[in-house]
């Protein structure tokens, strides 16, 4: 995540566990319009106080920004949210970055699903503790189309 982001950019974060919260905070501190959503309501109050927009549904959240970052426990959890018809439709033509943990086979399956639905997709992994998110010490791995990564690199 770079401090040299376009201040007019918008990002959505799905999943507000420790890592999702750290990501949303870093996006806010970088000056990005940040929309947040979590399966458990009410986990976003402190982020809203910092300037985040609370979405009432995952569909509303992904429709709010051209870039959605999902960070939940695993692909079963991300699939339960992303593969709902309304959410899948809202993601069409947008970029999805999945930072949830799972197997390479699940990553490939999700990339294929995204492609079938017109969703631009990057898979990722966080290789750092939440306390380093937003600093030069944070380490992320991303895979997918290089041009898509380059497009979003200033934010990621």
Question: Across the structure, where does each feature detected by a protein language model lie?
Answer:
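NAD(P)+-binding Rossmann beta1-loop-alpha1 motif at the extreme N-terminus of oxidoreductases
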Residues: 1-63, 67-70, 94
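A short acidic, helix-capping loop that chelates divalent metal ions and anchors anionic groups
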Residues: 43-45, 78, 131-134
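Short gly/ser/thr-rich secondary-structure transition/capping motifs
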Residues: 49-55, 78-81, 122-124
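Rossmann-fold NAD(P) dinucleotide-binding segment
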Residues: 59-71, 75-120
């Amino acid at each position: 995540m770079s401090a040299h982001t376009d201040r007019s950019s918008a990002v959505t974060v799905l999943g507000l566990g420790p890592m999702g919260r750290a990501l949303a905070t870093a996006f806010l501190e970088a000056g990005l319009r940040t929309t947040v959503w979590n399966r458990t309501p009410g986990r976003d109050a402190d982020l809203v106080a910092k300037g985040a927009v609370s979405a009432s549904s995952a569909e509303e959240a992904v429709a709010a920004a051209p870039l959605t970052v999902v960070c939940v426990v695993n692909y079963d959890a991300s699939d339960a949210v992303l593969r709902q018809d309304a959410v899948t439709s809202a993601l069409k033509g947008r970029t999805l970055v999945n930072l949830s943990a799972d197997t390479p086979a699940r990553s490939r399956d999700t990339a294929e699903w995204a492609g079938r639905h017109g969703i631009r997709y990057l898979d990722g992994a966080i290789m750092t503790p939440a306390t380093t998110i937003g600093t030069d010490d944070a380490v992320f791995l991303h895979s997918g189309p290089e041009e898509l990564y380059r497009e979003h690199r200033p934010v990621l």
